[in-house]
Amino acid sequence: SAASDVYKRQALNNLDEKKNYILDSLNYAASIQMAVFGSKSQILKHFKEGFILFKPKDIVSGDFYWFGSVEDEKIVVSADCTGHGVPAALMTIMGNDLLNEIVLQDKIIHPDKILEELDRKIINGLSNENGVERQDGMDMSIVTINAKKQRIYFAGAKNPLYIIYKNEIDTIKGSFFPIG
């Protein structure tokens, strides 16, 4: 019937409007997320040869990178938050903020100590008063580079470090435990 067709068209238009609203919100959230991560070009200024490969599967992502420097130490982080979509994207913001606090404010620069402190803060921050166990967390690689001393330090939480040298790839495994 004609009334049924009108109702279906209105319902489809309503769904289309809601879909567009959600997509606009997700795209805006993605631009905020990228602003939080910082400029790739600003990070790459610190390295003669380098690149950042960031190819999220969804509009907003649980993947993130982070960079900070404390005196002669350059700290680089690559992370993957558990989950997908918006919840994982929110975890990236939490991870970014906690790394700023741990490294830039508290001046913790050793990758293993950064992971320990991050783990503690995420567990405390996400603890549920009802005693319900949460499954939120991150897999992460952290490298601290001191070019003057020609030293690189690594720690990983379920993520390895890949070293490419003379067309060879070496893998250094991280721990089996995630953050959180």
Task: For each feature predicted by the language model, list its residue ranges.
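Short, small-residue-biased leader/transition segments that mark boundaries at the very start
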Residues: S1-Y7
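… and, occasionally, acidic/histidine-rich disordered N-termini of signaling adaptors
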Residues: A11-G180
